Structure formats: C-alpha cells, structure tokens
Amino acid sequence: MLRKFYQRVEKLLENRLLALTVLFGILFCVLICRVFILEIVQGESHKKDFTYKVQKTVKTSGTRGNIYDCNGKLLAYNKLVYTVTFQNDNEFKTLATKNKTSESYEKNKVIHEVVQILERNGDTFINDIPIEITGSGKFRFTETGSRLKKFKRDVFGIGSDTSDLTSAEKKLRNQQLNATAEQVFEYLRDGTMGSAGTGKMFDIDKKYSKEDALKIMSVRYSAFLSRYSQYMKVTIANGISSKSIAELEERSSELPGIDISTKSIRVYNKSEALSHVVGYTGTINSDELETYNKGKKESDKDYYSSDETVGKAGVEKQLESYLHGDSGSQTLIVNNIGKIVKTTKTVKAGTGNNVTLSIDSRLQEYVYKLLEKKIAGIVLSKLTTSDSKGSDREHIMIPIKSAYYALIGNGVIDLENLNGNDATAYEKKMYKKIQKLDDSAISMIKDMLLNSKKPYKKESDEKQAYADYVYKLLVKNKVLLSSSIDTEDKTYQQWKSEKIGLGQFLRYAINKEWIDISNLNVNNKYNNTEEVMKALVSYLENAMLEADDFDTTVCEQKINTGKLTGREVCLLLYEQGVLKKKGDSDYNSLKSGALNSYNFIYNKLKKLEITPAQLGLDPCSGSIVITDSKTGKIKALVSYPGYDTNRLSSGTDSGYYRQLATSSSTPLYNQALYHKTAPGSTFKPLSALAGLNEGVITTSTSIDCTGLYDKITPPAKCWKYPSSHGSLNVSGAIEASCNYFFYEVGYRLGNKSGTYNSEEGLKYLKKYATQLGLNKKSGVELGESVPQVSDETSVRSAIGQGRNSFTPVQISNYVTTLSNRGTVFDLSILNKVTDTNGKTVKEYKVKKRRQLNYKKQYWDAVQSGMRRVITGSNSSVSSLFQGVSYQIAGKTGTAQEDKSRPNHALFISYGPYTKPEISVTTVIPYGYTSSNAAATAKDVYKYYFANEKEKTKLEKDKTAKEAGSQAAGD
C-alpha cells in the first residue's frame, strides 16, 4: 500500500506539468496577498492617491507699485481686503449629473446664492457687465462709444475681418453691433440673437428675476472671458464683511467653485482733483491682454493673465510697465473633479516700482477746488429769473429754468428710477405726473402731425421742439431715410427753411418713398398717403414711449411752460439722495414754499452742494497748469471737472461710468491736455517777438490805433472800436491788448518784400511759434492733442485768431518760455521711478528743447508789456490786482468758438516778475471774459505765495462768490 503511494508520488514528480502548476499556485497566492494589502490594508491611502490627476501651474498677480507726489505724499496705494472668487469647477458637471440638471443651472444657482449672501450682509458685488435695469424696468448700457462696441464684439464673438462673411452673416453682424441692451441681455441669458450653433449661452432660468439674472450674468460673463484658463478665478466681490466671510465659510460645501482669499485693491487719495493725472486701474481687457503680451511667453514673469489689474488712464496707464508687479506662480495638484487639493510649489509674486510725480498734491487739490468755485461764481453772476438769455456773447444770461432742466438733462436726477422698487412716495407721485405730461405731449404731437396746417416757424416753441425731436427720431430709427432725401428738392428746402410744418413734409416724404414703411403697421403697400401717415404717427407714439430721451425732452418743454415747476424738480434732489434732508434747513423751506426754487439753486450753487459739473451749463469746465519756470516740471495739472477714481477702480459702480460718459460737462475729458482753443490775445507776445526779431518794428515803434484796420478786406476791428487806443509802442500794445497794433505787425511781416503776401506773414508767425514751442506737443508724458499753427490770414493770425489752436498745456509751455526768457522745455509731470528698496530705477531729468538768444531789449519790451497788464491804466484787468503783495506779469485772451455761446476766457502769467518761479495758465471754456480767468490766476498766486497759516485759512473757504462784471479788453 505504502509502496504504491510512493510510486504514484514518484510518477507525479516526474510529470513536467507539476512544476508549472506549483509555480502558478505560488504566483496566485502572491497575487491574492497583494490584492488584500492594496484593497484592505492600504485601500484608503490608494483611494486618495487615485484622485491625484493633474498638475497645473497658474499665475499669481504681483503687487502694484505706489504713486507719490513731489513731497512724498501717497496718491495711489494698495489695500489688502478679503475677496470672493468664482471658478468654473468640474464639480458642477458632477452635480448636474447627480441632480439631472445642467452645468449652467448649477453654476447659476451657486452664484445667485452667493450674491444673496453678500447683499444680505451689506456687501457689493462687482458688476463687470455694462448693462443696468432702470427703476421703470428698462435695460440700458452703462458704457458708450468704443468701449460699448468692444463689449458687443466680445459678447457676440465678432471679429474685425468681414471679407469671408456671407451677406446673411454680415447682416447678423450688423444687427449684433447695433443690439440694444435688452437684446444683449436676452442673448446672454438664453442665446437669442446668436448665430447658428451658439447654444444657450448662460442658460439662466426664467425663475430668476431680471435683476437677479443680470447679477448672475455679470459673474458668468467674467468667467466667460477667462474661459481659456480653466483654473482662473474671477472676483465676485472685494472687501467683504466678516459676516459674509463667516456665512460663506460655513456653507462652503454647498458652494462649489466659490473661494475666499485676500487681494490688493487700488485706493486713491484726493482722487477727484488728481483723477486726470493719476488715472485709475481696472481688469485687463482682451485688447490690452494682446498688447501687453506681444512677444512674451506664458512662462515670463511679466506675462499678463486674463484677470490682471492694469492702468486704464493717466500715470497708471502710461507707466504700467514700471508699476506692474511681476507675476508669481503656484504649481497645483488638481483632482478628478477639478478641485485644487494641494499646492506643491510657490514662486512669490513681485512688487512693482514706485513712481514719484512732480505734482504738488496739496497745490493741485486747492487749485482744483478754486477753479470749481470760480466757475460756479461765473454761473451765479449769470443766473436770471427771465426766460431770455440775450444775445450779446459777453452778457449771455442763464435762465433759471435752464438750471432746473439741467438737473434732469445732465442725469443728476434719474427719471428712469422714479418708479423703482425703492422709490419714495414723492418719486412715484412725480412719475405719474411725468407720465401724464408725456401723454399730453404725445397728443400735441399727434395733433400737429395729423391736423396742423401751420408752418414750422409759426408753431409754439414747445411744438417746434417736439417737431425737431420727431424728425431726429425718425432718422435715427431709419424710418425716414436720410440717404434717400434729395436735399435740393423744393419741398425739402421749404421744410429746412421752416416754411412748412413737419406733418406736410412727412406726407411729401411718404409720396417720395423717403419713408421706410416696412416698420409701420401697413398691410397693403398701396395704402393712400393718409393711411400711411396714420400708421407712421401710431409707430411714433410707441417709439417715443420706448425712447430713453423722450421723458427728458418733455420735461424740458414742460419746465419752460411752467407745467413742471422748479420746486418739484429741486425736491427730487433730496428724494434721490443727491442732497441729504438731515440737517439741511433749505429742504423744509423749499417744501413749504418759504424758499423759492431760484434762491434754492443759487444757495446750493454758492455752497457748491450743487456744482457747475452737475449742471453742465456754460461754463462748466476749465483747466489750470502751473509749471516751474526753471525746470519745465509741472506742479499742478488741473482739469475740471474730475471724477472719483475709487468708484471706477472698484468695479462695483456700473452706472457711474455711464453717468460720466454722458454728462455734458465731460468729466472724463482732460481739459488741460486735449481741449484745443484759439489762444486769442495771449498770442500777442509771440507776434511782438516775431515783429521785433524780423525788424518790422522796434521797441520804440509807435503805431496809431484808429479802431478800424482797413488795409485788408473786409476791414478788421480793434476790440475798442468804434473808439481807439491812439499811438502805442509794443509794450503799450501788449498792456492795452490793442488788436490794431498787432494787425499791423501781421501785415508788415507779410510785406517785407514790399508787397503784402499773407502766406509770407504766416511763414514768420509759424517760425516764431516753432521757436517758442507752440508747433509741437508740450512733451508731458500723458499724451495730448496735436497743436495747430494758423495757416490763414497773417493779419488776424497775429492776434491769435485764424486757425491757431492749442491746448492749455501747450500754452503753458509757451508762457514758461516767455517767463524764463527763451528756455524751451519738454514739460514733464514725472520725477523718478524707484524700486521697493528706494533705489532709483529711472530719473526724469529736465529736458531742454532749445535756448532762444533773442536780444535783451526785446525780452524787456515784451515782459514790460505783460507786467503792465497787471499794473497799467490801459489794462482791462489791472484793477483786479490792486493791492496784491506779489509781483506778476500776464496777458489776457478771449476766443470765440460759437456765436450763440460765451467766449472762452484765457489768462497766461508768471511770477515773481523779476525772478520767475512759476507760470500759471488758466483756460475757462465759455468763461465769458478773460477777467474771469485773470481773477482765478490771481487767487492761485495768492495761495502759492502764502505762508502756512494763510494757506490753511484759504483752504477752509468753501463758498463760491459771484464773478465781478469786468469790461472786455482783448
């Protein structure tokens, strides 16, 4: 038995398959053990390891450098705040699958919840989409011009090249570029108006109100712009409260894609006074991204990511390369649902360089406020209860009704919000009244179009205004086809000359097929003229009610006719928060009728509680440039009005930019750098130097002013005509600002060959304009308009007329050259750039353009004349400077641009007279007379030369005073 067993074993061992069987058995046991270890013993650890899917390197933004004034005062800096960010997390896909919804649905739900948390705790989210909903429920854009066009291009994905587009695609492109705010909203909400295949865009459920949908849309749009950077976060809100932080952290598991972090935001001191110099920052746009990253690789330290903050204007923009901090990076491990679970490497972001300006911020702020007071004083002096403004440019008055309307027309009072959810009872009452006024106006318009036989010129002022509005609206809406109109047509000419009414003209236009009836409710193209006319009037009724500006047009006319009172308008200032009721005695007095609306406006303007910028009447703007005579460094570059750069930089006030962009006072426009004006009589010192150097006059040459210069046709008049100045030398001519004297200089410059040739005279004037720095930009680092030296009529050009046109900063360069006797600088507002350790990176040294070697007696004669402008008995402004303790020299100037508006007021000056330190250039567009500019400059010097105690006292004066009535003299 045992023997048989051994034989079987021996036989089995001799079998070759046994070894393989044993080997496989051992391997199987090892495999089982290994699986046990991996799944049971180390299972949890490997489960975690399994989620480590992607390594990604992302950029982190650097810290922006600071901006300082010449005395080391901080003008722009960074403040560390808590922010809420949103990221297109892959977890939304998981949630959508789990909840059987869509990714968009889940994203919108989270964003809506976060916005509610923020608003519940008093925080404001960033609105990056330039659309707002008014109180009456209408959509409107908050940007205009090129910025609005770019927004539409980004939204619809519109390129600039149209060569490969079909006619249908071109038509769609045109529709998209002309899309209304509501159409853009609907497109972003659900894809309406998109090209084929664009999908649902953000697919925002109809359960959300329009207001909530717009808030969701704003965040989604920001993320959409960063769609090519999967791990890029977009900021929802900056500077959130501790309550919001606590609530968001507590609910973090319910809010995928949401994160709380710290971020530096830009803060500006003295923001309004320095707005046009320092500028502001904002999130980079696609064009800027392309520009700044040109020639760079993504790994470069100075490469810009799509959420970078960049300079948008002023020094912030011009010195972006210095102020911008180099980017850092983080190497991230991202799990299979897109969550960042680990940071493996951090490269610290850099800090930008600091910039020091030549601007004295204290001087800048004082001069800005001074200019505002002086402009307010001019307006105060011209306010009248009369309905007539007069016609004399030097005495044009401002009817108080114009001021009432200006509060509405210039957007200080927002009619669209009278019926908003938070509207007061008084606002709702006024909303109903304005609706009734609209209905009344529409009835008047319908009657005028359908029944009136009167010619335009015999209609009332109100009906004429409505006729003008209707005509422009029809052209704007392309119902009246202006391109089809035969402008030589007799009936059209009768309409233009006011000999027929609008109704008669439109009937004629229908017959001539100048009216596009496709937009009218006309079923039969063979309808007669009256049927089409009725359809046109019906169309107009709806179009006017939908138009943004119809309410304001009606209000203007109803104010003029007394149907809407000044008191009703002024009370809205309190209801809409422009003025505060608390502590304001004027409120109760106005409400009760104890204070009339004229005196109310007068008092508020005097206290600058209502400003010239808000009214937007003539004048409402101005500029002052103060330049160091010895270096060409600018100490103050003031442009009024300015704006609050903190509101623009924060990104939370979407309506503020629209308010600025549509204001008639043009606060976004840098008056000092871009507003070109004829220099007027401030050009006469240049003409004097040209005449002296070319030998057509000497310092002792006398010219007899007879008032009428008849060597040219038509004759040119001296400002004193029909009176005259009599015999004057060059210094006396500058003092008296005698046109006749300088007409003769211009004539003699063109008559050097013995025969008068205007072109020859212009050649010499241009020669000295070039030498004195007026033919080129001033050199200031912020950019400016191109100057223009006159190329027509040397006689009139010699007194600053013709086609001479310069900006205030260019005129400042010119008067600085006059003050220092011939040193022409490139002006500058920059002193230096330093790194974080204070080491100088770049120094902006004084740059001389040229040195003019004119004879001493020529300088003496010109400067003596400018001094006599301040002290002489023949000067129109010398009485302003009586009793001043400082010695200055100056020259007045006025320039006419529009015969229906006041003259521009200019005054150039420098001081002290014998050893000049500074030049001061003052320009007030539509400022009536040069005496207003001279009075402003006088107070600039008063502050500049004052001691500390006197400066402090002057800074406390916050009240405007009526401008004095000064005789014209230039």
Kindly give the residue locations of the regions a language model identified:
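Membrane-proximal periplasmic segments of bacterial cell-envelope enzymes
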Residues: M1-L605, Q614-S623, S629, G746, ...
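Active-site SXXK
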Residues: R34, G72, I111-E113, L248, ...
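Second-shell loop/turn segments in exported
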Residues: K53-K56, N88-S104, Q230-N238, K263, ...
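Active-site beta-strand/loop architecture of penicillin-binding DD-peptidases
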Residues: G65-Y68, K263, V267-N269, S275-N293, ...
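A short, polar/charged loop-to-alpha-helix boundary motif
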Residues: V84-A96, G642-S663
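Conserved catalytic neighborhood of penicillin-recognizing serine enzymes
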Residues: N353-N354, I398-K446, L450, L668, ...
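Mid-domain, small-residue-enriched loop/turn segments at the edges of structured enzyme/sensor domains
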Residues: S621, A716-P722, Y756-V795
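Short, well-structured active-site flanking segments
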Residues: N646-S649, F683, L692-I712, G822-V833
